Curated annotation (Swiss-Prot):
Its EC number is 3.2.1.39. This is Probable glucan endo-1,3-beta-glucosidase btgC. It comes from Aspergillus fumigatus (strain CBS 144.89 / FGSC A1163 / CEA10) (Neosartorya fumigata). Glucanases play a role in cell expansion during growth, in cell-cell fusion during mating, and in spore release during sporulation. This enzyme may be involved in beta-glucan degradation. Active on laminarin and lichenan. The active site is at residues 491, 590. The gene is btgC. Residues 329-688 are extracellular. Keywords: Carbohydrate metabolism, Cell membrane, Cell wall biogenesis/degradation, Glycoprotein, Hydrolase, Membrane, Polysaccharide degradation, Signal-anchor, Transmembrane, Transmembrane helix. The keyword Transmembrane helix applies.
Length: 688
């Protein structure tokens, strides 16, 4: 994920698909182990109305093998249709991208889509967009319980996905090592992000080791950071918001800020400054390049423009310092020196720089005591088809001064190999892909595959650097079979704002260039892109070899007991349906749930209480995994879980009561499984 709340529309769009209600569904009697949920009506937490639920079942149109065939249950829809709204990354987020912070990060930027999408259409009923598949019942969904009423969905925040921390460029040859507490690259901007600090609430677990100290973070002067001028950043003016009480600088923009460059955030690929009018209850403020921020209603009269720029400049300066410190802290040795739960780490008792790590521990491999301990965690199960991953410290250009640690990547891969056989990267900067390949080689992992990531930015310099590095990686690879494909861009269309048409053309051109290079080199690898589920249309489907959609029920304000069903239903109706009549594969490229930090009620509105909507927490994360993971494994749903490890530096993107940006991992930054969290074992079945 990448950016504040991403939205998903239920519009027909250019795909020309018929309204869901017009489809005839044939049920199949499969997976009889899917049991019905409670008898009787369930209360809709959003409106208090009773909702009848039936059993999970399957549709014939491309949904084979998705459950048993119970009697169709009545529609769960009511007379209202909630519409959340935003998502991720700004063009400032340079190359490589980090896994992402979480949605609230981009609250300062409009979702770039608005209520205008509803204008000029004939709603099926009051306040319900005609393009929505409102008549589809939950009986066609293999997950239990069934989905709630249709509503606009969100994607991951800037915090999530690539937006989290834009990754950087190829790192000069450096020896592998650890990160030290005296090195800025080893420290988080805030030493104790999980403890109560001001408005920041403690997470489900406390900080350890390097993070538990009370030392002040190392100051970093952004003027000392190398910059190639390709990462523009400017904070959004502080607009009055009826939809959000707090706003945050987008993760991608924040990453760009690390370079110390202030610039106008135009639409992706030179997009216009007009806000996207596709979705959302309130028109945007025209910052299409911003992350997936919630809708921000402009102040009447426009406010004082000059004062706004002054305040913006000051805020930008502050954010630059924060992001620089936070991003640099991405390579914290905390990961390398903590012992994993149920596994004893044999080395790394103190934080070290990358070079010091190698000097002390050597180039870690499968025979290293520390690695053996990490690879023997009985609480981890290989039940995820894929996991989104970005190594720490790969923000460009910070990685040029504070190189990431090879040993830390090796440690991460030792853990990831117990969860999945498939890892997705977001960019090529800072040697991140090469480090992952080296780790796989040292660990002698034979069944791990990689989806290569290429960060596409509004600045051609960034995109060019990323693509050229992809070519080098492919050309230098000893064995191409380790790669599953290349993902060119993450949520590029979302970040394009209202100028999606030209952005799509540019994106498709980049994809075609990569395809041509592969063909020239006789490389048979699929080329795709990942974006919000509702940003896909027939044109993009035709250009991509694989349809990859980021779908986050949390940002849609979906109660966790309905989240799994909602996710599958949304994906089926908006993405799988687009591939009907083709042989193209569909993958959910990001899906997950935060382990703490508040709750989200969608629509850009404040929650009435702390239990409304989607609640972040370990119990809720367990519930979502319980409803999603094993059933997805049984029915063959292909997806990437977001994400394996927390990224504490992202605390800088937490705002008000939305403190989940740094809490999307199954494990903390030290690779400890979070207290109380249980990864399903699915009866011993594993992902292949």
């Amino acid at each position: 994920m990448s950016g504040p709340n991403r939205t998903y529309s239920f519009g027909e769009g250019d795909d020309g698909l018929a309204h869901p209600s017009s489809r005839t569904h044939a049920m199949h009697s499969q997976y009889d182990d899917v049991s019905p949920i409670s008898d009787g009506a369930r209360m809709n937490p959003m409106n208090g109305q009773g909702m009848d639920h039936g059993l999970a079942s399957v549709l014939e149109d491309g949904r084979q093998g998705w459950g048993r065939s119970p009697e169709p249950s009545p529609s769960l829809l009511t007379g209202s249709s909630a519409t959340p709204g935003m998502d991720n990354l700004g063009p400032g987020a340079v190359g490589g991208g980090i896994s992402g912070i979480a949605l609230s990060v981009a609250n300062s930027h409009d979702r770039l889509s608005g209520v205008e999408a509803l204008m000029g259409t004939d709603g099926q009923e009051a306040n319900i967009p005609a393009e929505r598949g409102l008549s589809t019942t939950g009986s066609d969904n293999p997950y239990v319980p069934e989905p709630p009423e249709y509503r606009y969905s969100y994607g991951s925040n800037i915090a999530l996905g690539a937006a989290a921390a834009p990754a950087g460029q190829l790192t000069p040859g450096q020896s592998v090592s650890h990160l030290s507490s005296t090195n800025p690259s080893q420290r988080n901007l805030y030493d104790i992000p999980y403890q109560d600090v001001g408005g920041l609430n403690a997470g489900p677990y406390q900080r350890h080791s390097a993070y538990s100290s009370n030392d002040l973070p190392v100051d970093i002067n952004p003027d000392e950071i190398v910059d190639d001028g390709d990462d523009g950043f400017v904070p959004a003016p502080n607009s009055g918001s009826g939809a959000r009480k707090s706003q945050a600088i987008p993760a991608a923009a924040g990453g760009a800020a690390a370079g110390g460059v202030l610039g106008n955030l135009g639409g992706l690929f030179g997009g216009k400054s007009a806000a996207d009018t596709s979705y959302g209850p309130v028109p945007g403020a025209g910052l299409e390049a911003g992350e997936k921020g919630r809708w921000v209603k402009p102040k009447p009269g426009g406010g004082n423009k000059k004062r706004g720029w002054i305040v913006g400049a000051i805020l930008a300066f502050i954010i630059i310092g924060a992001i620089v410190g936070g991003a640099v802290g991405g390579t914290i040795g905390h990961r390398g020196n903590e012992e994993p739960s149920s596994a004893s780490s044999a080395s790394s008792s103190s934080t070290q720089t990358a070079t010091e790590d190698t000097s002390v521990n050597g180039d870690l491999d499968k025979n290293s005591a520390e690695i053996k301990a990490l690879m023997n965690n009985k609480n981890l199960h290989k039940v995820f088809p894929g996991i989104d991953y970005t190594p720490w410290g790969v923000q460009y250009p910070l990685c040029l001064k504070y190189p990431p640690s090879q040993n830390n990547v090796t440690r991460d891969m030792a853990v990831l190999t117990q969860l999945t056989n498939n890892v997705r990267l977001y960019g090529t900067d800072c040697n991140q892909t090469e480090m992952v390949l080296h780790a796989i080689d040292k660990l002698e992992i034979k069944d791990m595959k990689i989806w290569l990531g290429v960060w596409i930015d509004s600045n051609e310099t960034t995109s060019r650097r990323q693509i050229d590095q992809l070519y080098k990686i492919i050309d230098d690879a000893k064995d191409i079979s380790i790669f599953n494909g290349a993902i060119v861009g993450n949520e590029a269309l979302y970040r394009a704002g209202s100028d999606k048409t030209s952005a799509q053309t540019t994106l498709i051109n980049y994809m075609q260039e990569v395809k041509d290079h592969f063909k020239k080199k006789n490389i048979d690898l699929p080329v795709a892109t990942s974006d919000l589920g509702d940003n896909w249309d027939a044109t993009l489907v035709q250009a991509a070899d694989v349809v990859m959609a980021n779908v986050h029920p949390f940002f849609g304000g979906i109660p966790v007991d309905q989240a799994a069903a909602w996710t599958w239903r949304f994906w089926q109706d908006h993405n799988v349906a687009l591939t009907k009549g083709t042989n193209k594969k569909q993958i959910i490229s990001e899906v997950g749930w935060p382990s703490g930090g508040g709750n989200d009620c969608g629509q850009g509105a404040n929650c009435p209480n702390d239990t409304a909507g989607a609640v972040a927490g370990v119990d809720e994360l367990n519930k979502f995994m319980e409803d999603w993971v094993c059933q997805a494994l049984d029915n063959g749903t292909d997806y990437f879980w977001f994400e394996a490890f927390d990224e504490p530096w992202k605390i800088v993107y937490n705002t008000g009561k939305e403190n989940w940006e740094d809490k999307w991992g199954l494990m903390d930054s030290a690779r400890n499984l979070k207290p109380g969290l249980k990864i399903p074992d699915c009866g011993g079945k594993t992902a292949t």
